[in-house]
């Protein structure tokens, strides 16, 4: 069972050179450098995940002036439904002692792609009707 759904920003990063191949990416955690988790979403069970719009904003100066870095929606996720990927993962047969366990965090993939960040600054992802999550990178 899913305990909660949270808004999040996944930071893509790799210890390996670009083009190292699928097995190397698997060994490197699928290029997951960090996960910035925001607030839990109330009443998430009734949401149409594929219809939720997401805007990623970047600000190099102050938080008040920003530009849109990327635009997407939950439809960009496998089969157009981010929660569907969680169900698919939960239904994959696994060896005893391996598989999903209570308390684990599952990311479903990017709704906005993986845009290159212009450098240090304030970044905010807005999830239509649900709220936002933000992160600040410093030099």
Where are these regions (language model features)?
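A broadly tuned preference for mixed-charge, low-complexity surface segments
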Residues: 28-41, 105-124
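Charged, cofactor-coupling segments
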Residues: 115-139
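A conserved acidic, glycine/proline-rich C-terminal tail/linker
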Residues: 85-118
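Catalytic-core "active-site belt" of small-molecule-metabolizing enzymes
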Residues: 1-81, 86, 95, 132-139
């Amino acid at each position: 069972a899913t305990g909660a759904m949270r808004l999040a920003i996944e930071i893509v990063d790799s210890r390996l050179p670009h083009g190292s191949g699928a097995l190397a990416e698997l060994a490197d955690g699928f290029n997951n450098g960090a996960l910035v988790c925001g607030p839990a979403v109330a009443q998430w069970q009734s949401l149409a995940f594929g219809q939720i719009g997401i805007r990623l904003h970047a600000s190099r100066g102050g938080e008040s002036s920003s530009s849109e870095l990327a635009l997407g929606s939950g439809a960009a996720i496998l089969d157009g439904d981010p929660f569907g990927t969680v169900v698919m993962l939960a239904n994959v047969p696994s060896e005893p002692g391996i598989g999903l366990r209570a308390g684990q965090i599952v990311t479903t993939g990017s709704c906005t792609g993986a845009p290159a960040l212009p450098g240090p600054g304030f970044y905010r992802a807005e999830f239509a009707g649900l709220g936002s999550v933000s992160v600040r990178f410093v030099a």
